[in-house]
From Swiss-Prot:
Known partners and oligomeric status: Part of the 30S ribosomal subunit.
One GO term of the biological process aspect: translation
SUPFAM superfamilies, alphabetized: Nucleic acid-binding proteins
Name this polypeptide is given: Small ribosomal subunit protein uS12
Phylogenetic classification of the source organism: Archaea, Thermoproteota, Thermoprotei, Thermoproteales, Thermoproteaceae
Organism, scientific name: Pyrobaculum aerophilum (strain ATCC 51768 / DSM 7523 / JCM 9630 / CIP 104966 / NBRC 100827 / IM2)
Alphabetized UniProt keyword annotations: Ribonucleoprotein, Ribosomal protein, RNA-binding, rRNA-binding
């Protein structure tokens, strides 16, 4: 008579718990979380925002079925020197950003920390330029300070 695959009985709880914990490692999401792989390879190193210097302005072509050039900037982060591409939101906002400006970037909010919508490979967006909110500059509420 073949044995049972799972222990059962009054004192089997510990064994069942250990078995469950062992098999959790087969789950990719659990493994990434436990080994800290998200923070390890994250340019922001787990922080919600980061400061950086604009290296260049770039246009990223939108994915199908859209045909557009999404305005982005290449940013070198101050904290670790890594270079990332950040999307510049709002119509005509790229005109308020020059090379060597200091910007603050945050995650763009795509699924599972990835890129959003039709912008391939872009995981961040610009929220501040030289310490002033990009939205405030765009609305005309504040002047962009010159450095």
């Amino acid at each position: 008579m073949p044995g049972k695959k799972s222990p059962y009985g009054l004192f089997a709880g510990g064994k069942l718990k250990r078995k469950r914990q062992k098999f959790r490692w087969n789950d990719v999401t659990y493994k990434r979380k436990m080994l800290g792989l998200v923070e390890k390879y994250d340019p922001l190193e787990g922080a919600p925002m980061a400061r950086g210097i604009v290296l260049e302005k770039v246009g990223v072509e939108a994915r199908k079925p859209n045909a557009a050039v999404r305005k982005c900037v290449r940013v070198q982060l101050v904290k670790n020197g890594k270079v990332v591409t950040a999307f510049v939101p709002l119509d005509g906002s790229l005109n308020y950003i020059n090379e060597h400006d200091e910007v603050v970037i945050e995650r763009i909010g795509g699924p599972e920390g990835r890129s959003l919508g039709d912008i391939p490979g872009v995981r961040f967006k610009v929220i501040k330029v030289n310490g002033v909110s990009l939205w405030a500059i765009w609305r005309g509420k504040k002047q962009k300070p010159t450095r």
